[in-house]
Amino acid sequence: MDQLFPTPLANLDPVELVAAETRPAPPDRPWVLVNMVASIDGAIEVEGRSGGLSSRADKAMFHALRQLPDVIMAGAGTVRVENYGPVKLDADAQARRVARGQQALPRLAVVSGRAHLDPASRLFSDPTQRPIVITTTNASSDAVDELRDVADIIFAGSDTVDLRAAFAELREQGMKTLLCEGGPTLNNQLLRDDLVDEWCQTIAPVLTGGNAAQPSTGSPPQVARSLQLARVVVEDDVLLLRYARES
């Protein structure tokens, strides 16, 4: 894995690379990082899943980025399709996190406006890693009650999830960095609410055609957010890009 920008460097360790980057948390919410993989023509899935676009380089960056945050967030649809389970990091990664003053493992947060999640699913299979479910006050009380035994609940918003309010609660709990892994609807809400501080995207050397989903889907924000190119890494024709909010 070689860096082309800002400084050309060869044979980089992605774990060391991302750990050296600065991510200052705002006072009222975590620093929000989105990580996605897409084809050259912008598709984020092949036959409904992102795995068809992944590669050795993308997987290495995916695992490196997962070692950084205090909380990993995904939408309920992504959690179901990708069959999310408890976060796993090796002993060295956990030790590095503890040395930085973090918990050994990041929390996992799932956004579901109606709390329609199966408490018996793999997501909730480890009682030592209780996910956070971010939902609304209008969610079914029966659905919420079923989840209380296996998850911590954050209520934010009534009809739709208020991400800014949810992030304020996470920040109050001491979480300074949040990694969002999609899907595109959740990404779009982050953009509409101007909550994206960093966008990392792997460009797979593939053309898919068709009408596959894009990294962000939905009504566009009123004002487009400009980000600065912060890093370009390449491996085997795969580009790994990092854009960050202007400091």
Model-derived regions, located:
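Enzymes that bind and transform nitrogen-containing heteroaromatic metabolites
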Residues: 1-247
